[in-house]
Amino acid sequence: MLFHLSGLYSALYFLATLLMIVYKSQVFSYPCNCLALDLVLLLLMGILKVAQLYLGTKGNLMEAEVPLAASLAFTAVGGLLSVHFLLWQTLVLWMDSVLSTVLLVLHGLEAGLQVVVIADFIR
């Protein structure tokens, strides 16, 4: 259930963040190199999220530790990218903070449950 909620929220987050980056580039003086970096990191975050959800679902259905461990690693990297969009982005709007905080909470819940499930599968 959490994977479905996370996947749905990540799609919303990706779209909202993309629109906010476009907005910031039009309204504010946003450096081009920072704009390109933010767009590349957002695209990387989307690709990692798809891989994380696929491996997490596959590992959960097969009760296999390796896909879940890979999904946990992708969750950690996704959390770091969320921190980037929360704190280290060139311009951080209030909505960026809210969306990234909710995404970090979801990453934390996913990571905690993945650790518990991996420990259960190893036993």
Swiss-Prot record:
GO terms for cellular component: ciliary transition zone; membrane. It is a multi-pass membrane protein. The keyword Nucleotide-binding does not apply. It is found in: Membrane; Cell projection, Cilium. It holds the Pfam family Transmemb_17. The keyword Lipoprotein does not apply. Keywords: Cell projection, Membrane, Transmembrane, Transmembrane helix. PANTHER family: GEO07735P1-RELATED-RELATED (PTHR13531), TRANSMEMBRANE PROTEIN 80 (PTHR13531:SF8). This is Transmembrane protein 80. The lineage of its organism: Eukaryota, Metazoa, Chordata, Craniata, Vertebrata.
